């Protein structure tokens, strides 16, 4: 059951926080809205606030319209559209902004990714950085995606929050993909 998994995760995060004295980010995601969107955000807001009262913040992740899992893909219909911004702001939910997911959503739904970043700037708590192309090409090396993505990546580099490089298979070959991403991100940052 999902709530039992969430309870165990929060308990573990709390133990890590007590051990380290620092906050432990817990990033989660949702898949499909089975009821109406307002009810979805009300229910999830209440759930996340309950865990926050126990000292652990769970931050929902911005999702792609088509998510790839080992073995296939699934269409997602929440936390990936411009209309979700209003709900996130109204319910004061923090967000893990996954840049490659945002790019895929921009390409699928035809919205301005920069506008979403601007509208959620006070709620972005955590950022995942990777490039993307088309509607389902996620986790690409920085610079290997759609050319207009570099401006979006530049925009988020100055946000004061935890950032994680999330290039697909970046850990292989002694972290070659992560190293390449760090070098490219440093070039982008220094060129501003």
Where are these regions (language model features)?
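Histidine-acidic metal/acid-base catalytic patches
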Residues: 3, 7-22, 46-47, 90-192
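Active-site acidic/histidine proton-transfer and metal-coordination neighborhood
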Residues: 1-94, 104
